[in-house]
Amino acid sequence: MVTTATKKTQTSTSTRNKRRPARSGAELTKEQNAESGFTASAELSENLQKVLVDLIELASQGKQAHWNVVGKNFRDTHRQLDEIIEAAREFSDTVAERMRALHALPDGRSDTVAETTTLPEFPQGEIDTAEVVDLVTERLEATIGTCRDVHDAVDEEDPTSADILHAILEKLEQFAWMVSAENRVPAT
């Protein structure tokens, strides 16, 4: 037997648990997100985008170096480049997915990357390992510089995204040290 109190409870529960129909499209994202979570500001989106394009370009230029490196320590340099490329790809995916979690739109298209990266153009043709070491170190340091340039603004708005930058910085700085050590001479 269903009493009036039971009916009220059932009605109240079914009203509370009623889900909204699924929506899609950019116009509704801000409305939905305003109801349920954090939306990245334009500045946060732009800062994460800067890191994203440099990571994508780092992976691309790393592959160019990987294919065209020749000379002493070829095998070690070739393998080390694979490690850098893999890390840059994983980090770019992490940054892009973080942007989506914040309802920002990552843009990894080749024309966007080419137009906005801070990395200098990579030379064509075969390149000696010693030169590759210098070129890759320069690109690692440029990407590190981008992460450091945007860090404080990112941290102020979204500490979680700043934590991602910390992980990127730690690994890229380690790579820069290890790669650059190939061409260093001991201090006398």
Regions of interest found by a model, annotated:
Residues R100-R109, R139, T146, T188:
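Alpha-helix capping/hinge segments and adjacent helical runs
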Residues D111-A167:
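Acidic/histidine-rich alpha-helical segments that form the ligand environment
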Residues T29-V51, T129, V136:
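Disorder-to-helix initiation segments
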Residues L52, A59, H66, I85, ...:
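A structural signal for well-ordered alpha-helices, especially hydrophobic packing surfaces
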Residues V70, D76-T112:
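Conserved alpha-helical segments that form or flank metal/cofactor-binding pockets of metalloenzymes
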Residues M1-E31:
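Polybasic, lysine-enriched low-complexity intrinsically disordered terminal tails
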